[in-house]
Amino acid sequence: LLERAEEQGVAPADLSICLGIPHDADVSDMKDRLAKYPRIRLFSISDRILGNSEVAIGHSSEALEQGKALLSHLIVLGFSVDDACARLQFRLHLGDDLFLEAARLRAFREAWAKVVDEFKPEHDCSHNTWIQAVVGYPEIVGSPHENVIRDTLQAISAITGGCHGLTIP
């Protein structure tokens, strides 16, 4: 993938992708190679919840715990705190409550900053995290117009909440 991007003239700093590597993978051999690619994320941590806002808060805290464990794992493998933070992304699924979901994404971002603070990063930008918001499938299948409206509202809540990427299946 990296060779292909170089062949096509993509600057290393412009290549932004998440590889989605399994969480238990040994990526220590990739550390030096990825040094010039600051926007390549290795791991995606998902809250795996579809459309139930009441339960989503608990799943968000589980995602934070998984992120903290992966951060520790990367540091043990020799990554700096700052580089390890840049190699993670969170995939958060959205529900139908516009305001709750926007607030949840913002709260998640703040909670992650507190987790990162424990590791004492050198750069403040390490407190930020990539959030890939995912529009949830409706539990009740209505008319196509209703589903378009629901997806649009979820997308608005994701953007308002500060996501970096948005997946609309």
What do these predicted regions represent?
Residues L1-D97, E101, F119-E122, N128-W130, ...:
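Catalytic alpha/beta active-site cores
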Residues E62-A69, A103-A111, S143-Q154:
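Generic recognition of stable, solvent-exposed alpha-helical segments in well-folded globular domains
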Residues V115:
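Catalytic core of soluble alpha/beta enzymes
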Residues E146-I168:
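Conserved phosphate/anionic-ligand binding catalytic regions in large, soluble enzymes, centered on
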